[in-house]
């Protein structure tokens, strides 16, 4: 369990995806989706890392590609691109497909980015000027998310995979701002979560926001399946959706059923805390002050979870949680690793000098 806790804490703090210039700050992506998209960069991230991106057709010489159109940067003067042998795609490229190539800014080499069927020129032209997520304002995020939600009806594998990966990198508060753009039936038909299990967490979050009979039925069935298996990666997302649908009035039941029940495993309890964290950070369906009040009860009944609560206390600069966290530190009921994590969080909230003045002698 201790190893799981460390992994969870890393995921909750965030995942930094670094590739040349594209960096995903840990505070942006909804943590209930962290880890579901895999380590590889999304199509958009790859385009961001290129100074030129274009569509081409493969010639009889497999390494040569005839340029069709450019959707980012300046069109090369030569009408063909010669791809390094190491960058050639695995297997055969369908004759009807266009090939997307990018000239990477840092390595100054051409890269194979994927294949796409003809007829998506306008979509690619919209992708070309997209910015790093680190540079997006709230309005930029909303516009970007609405663009990808509007792409769900395109029956094109590259586009649907891109939509999944980009929405998975979206802050939960932005997802909520796009509520009117969510269509539960379209989400299920397009993202096919039963066929692609890695998409289930994102779909659960979006269906929790969209609501309606179709969404509620899928969420209910998914919760039954998760309860049966007790090892699913979508538990946190399903609990976020539960909180979104039921609101703050359900918090007492949520605490009893999902956090303090004796039958729960530590991982299940921490998934529930992650769901509370997502809602508290968004400060929407569940106001942050209600999450903080529930955290006080968590610290009383499950002090072994204090390190995770402390992470949110630091992120929200929530001083009301400092006294109970200090009491837990002084009681010596958590592991050494948890003590260090809680100590760093307290220092972040109250400042180094005040923290060192008030800390327990055992921390010296």
Task: Please tell me what each predicted stretch does.
Residues 1-5:
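N-terminal secretory signal peptides that target proteins for export/translocation
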Residues 22-155, 159, 165-169:
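Transition segments tied to proteolytic processing and entry into folded domains
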Residues 126-138, 161-177, 198-212, 233-247, ...:
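Structural detector for internal amphipathic alpha-helices that build alpha-solenoid repeat scaffolds
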Residues 141-149, 173-189, 212-225, 248-260, ...:
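Amphipathic alpha-helical scaffolding segments comprising HEAT/armadillo-like alpha-solenoid repeats
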Residues 146-153, 161-165, 188, 192, ...:
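Amphipathic alpha-helical repeat scaffolds
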Residues 150-158, 192-198, 225-230, 261-264, ...:
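Short coil turns that connect the paired helices of HEAT/ARM alpha-solenoid repeats
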Residues 346-364:
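Terminal, non-catalytic domain-edge segments
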